[in-house]
Each structure stands twice: as structure tokens, then as C-alpha cells.
Design a protein with these regions (language model features):
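Glycine- and acidic-residue-biased ligand/ion/polar-headgroup-sensing regions
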Residues: 69-88
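Short histidine-centered beta-strand/loop micro-motifs
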Residues: 64-69, 86, 111-113
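Short beta-strand segments in beta-sandwich/barrel cores
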Residues: 63-65, 81-85, 99
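A short beta-loop-beta micro-motif enriched in histidine and acidic residues
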Residues: 48-50, 61-74
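A short, N-terminal "cap"/entry segment at the start of jelly-roll beta-barrel domains
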Residues: 2-6, 14-55, 100-101, 131-138
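Short acidic-glycine-tyrosine-enriched beta hairpin
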Residues: 58-59, 88-105
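Ligand-binding loop in jelly-roll beta-barrel domains
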Residues: 91, 105-129
Length: 138
């Protein structure tokens, strides 16, 4: 009987340690963005939509999951590299001076796969009173 207690204790300790490590790894998600919003205001000729301009700082290993917006989005990279992926297409690396356009509803994501921060300016024209983004359907 004593011969079984020690191996059982070792196995139990291993299971507990693995569970704790798994929870810690799950909690350490990729860093998110730091946004600085310059303005958001209604469009003069269409008050159901609004235009906004913001600066985004993305830390190394930062990024987001696939998502979509209720409007159009333009991005211009100022510093670092931003890996931009439209769902189902190959990723594109944007560098300072590069820009891109995402039409309404297109599923996409941005990531900083480098070891340096990335900064970009983003202009959006979205439907007013709707969430700025929604997770892509599975």
C-alpha cells in the first residue's frame, strides 16, 4: 500500500503544477493597443455616420483577433511594422509610410510581430451609435 502512495503523490503534484502553468499561460495574452483619440464627430451630410481619427501604439507581440467594423477604416503606419491580415488572404507587412484601406464589414486583424513598438494613424468612418468593432464569427 505504501508503495502506491508515493507514486500517486508525484502524479498528483505533476497534475496540479501543469494545471497552474496552463492557467498562467492563458492569462498572459498578447498586449493590447494604446489608443489616443484626436476626434470623433458626425459627418455633416450624413449624421447617422461619424468620422474619427486616432493614433495607435502597438507594443511588441501586440495585436488583436479577427474582427470587423461597421464602416470604413484607413491606416497609415508611422513607426515600426504592422502585420495586416484580411481573413483568407496572405498577411501583408506595413512599414512607415505604408497605408491600407479596409471596407465596411471586411474581417481583418493587425499584429506587431516584431520586437519594437509600432505606431499608426487610423481614420474611420463608421455608423454612429454602433460598437466600433465586433469579433469575427466562427
Amino acid at each position: 500500500m505504501n508503495k502506491l502512495i508515493i507514486p500517486a503523490a508525484i502524479v498528483a503534484t505533476g497534475i496540479i503544477a501543469a494545471s497552474a502553468w496552463s492557467q498562467q499561460a492563458t492569462q498572459q495574452a498578447a498586449p493590447k493597443f494604446q489608443n489616443k483619440r484626436y476626434f470623433t464627430m458626425p459627418l455633416e451630410k450624413d449624421p447617422t455616420r461619424e468620422v474619427g481619427l486616432q493614433s495607435v501604439l502597438m507594443p511588441p507581440a501586440g495585436g488583436n483577433e479577427f474582427h470587423r467594423h461597421p464602416g470604413d477604416q484607413w491606416t497609415a503606419v508611422q513607426e515600426g511594422e504592422v502585420t495586416f491580415t484580411i481573413y483568407g488572404k496572405p498577411p501583408v507587412v506595413l512599414k512607415p509610410g505604408d497605408s491600407n484601406y479596409v471596407p465596411r464589414g471586411v474581417i481583418h486583424r493587425q499584429q506587431n510581430l516584431s520586437d519594437k513598438p509600432a505606431r499608426y494613424i487610423e481614420m474611420r468612418i463608421f455608423d454612429k451609435d454602433k460598437p466600433a468593432s465586433e469579433a469575427a464569427p466562427n
